[in-house]
Swiss-Prot record:
GO terms for molecular function: ATP binding; ATP hydrolysis activity; ATP-dependent DNA damage sensor activity; damaged DNA binding; single-stranded DNA binding. Gene3D superfamilies: P-loop containing nucleotide triphosphate hydrolases (3.40.50.300). It comes from the Bacteria. The keyword RNA-binding does not apply. Can catalyze the hydrolysis of ATP in the presence of single-stranded DNA, the ATP-dependent uptake of single-stranded DNA by duplex DNA, and the ATP-dependent hybridization of homologous single-stranded DNAs. It interacts with LexA causing its activation and leading to its autocatalytic cleavage. Keywords: ATP-binding, Cytoplasm, DNA damage, DNA recombination, DNA repair, DNA-binding, Nucleotide-binding, SOS response. InterPro entries: AAA+_ATPase (IPR003593), DNA_recomb/repair_RecA (IPR013765), DNA_recomb/repair_RecA_CS (IPR020584), P-loop_NTPase (IPR027417), RecA-like_C (IPR049261), RecA-like_N (IPR049428), RecA_ATP-bd (IPR020588), RecA_C_sf (IPR023400). Belongs to the RecA family. This is Protein RecA.
Amino acid sequence: MADDRKAALDAALKKIEKNYGKGAIMKLGEKVDQQISTIPSGSLALDVALGVGGYPRGRIVEVYGPESSGKTTVALHAIAEVQKGGGTAAFIDAEHALDPQYAQKLGVNIDDLLLSQPDTGEQGLEIADALVSSGAVDIVVIDSVAALVPRAEIDGEMGDTHVGLQARLMSQALRKLSGSINKTKTIAIFINQIREKVGIMFGNPETTPGGRALKFYSTIRLEVRRAEQLKSGTDIIGNRTKIKVVKNKVAPPFKVAEVDMMYGQGISQEGELLDMAVEQDIVDKSGAWYAYKGDRIGQGRENAKNYMREHQEMMMEVSARVRDAYGIGTGETVIEIEDAQEELPLDE
């Protein structure tokens, strides 16, 4: 009887593989590819917070937060890192607000960046699907989910109610996209805004537009918020920003990366490197003074950052020691994972 069941199972498996290709079904113990490669985020502190040294390939990432908190900056740094490694990047600008000059300052090669400014949400998501399905794009950024307006809403009159249209659009698109994203090992970053629920007395009233589907399909969700202003004298030169890993299916979540987002420069690599070097006792901090290998490098954090910027050899040496202390490489990495599974939502 047992032999009959085994023969029937073998026949069924062969039929499935014949119809749908090799690898369509397999025993979990036989699965060879239990590894996932990652792309650096462009921020050493964020790479550490993500737990795997960057964004995992073939996964969906949601970056959300208040206005002007640095969401697009986080995504542009990821694009710059992909391009540094010789990859291809696409930016779907549904908000029609991308600043090419700012992107260039962050290290993005705007000559090679694929840019689309869709008229409707359906068009934007169809373009994203076509790019992902091609298998020739390494990262696709959609900015933003809130700006992916359904065609019916654009064609309608001001004041018309379209209940759940955007949520259904996102749910349908993600069902289609998630498989091809995983198959082609493309990173999809969805930037999202926040809204407030009306009449909430207890708990967090904040929510993100586009329904619940994106929350479920995302492997990583990042919350970006400004913590404080950075000043040089009386001039405001940037913001201290907290990036919280709210959800992570490839490493422990709820870690926080604190970075300096400087106006016109993006994430300050010197600032985060200095903080992490002090934390690992690679750079000594005594009062307001910072010292490396017994030599003082600056009084006050901004002076120490400037010193590191002007002495690139020392900065590279400190960076190598910090990366070694945290166990993070300098480029694309491959890690072994145990991925948690989640129940996917019904249409909203």
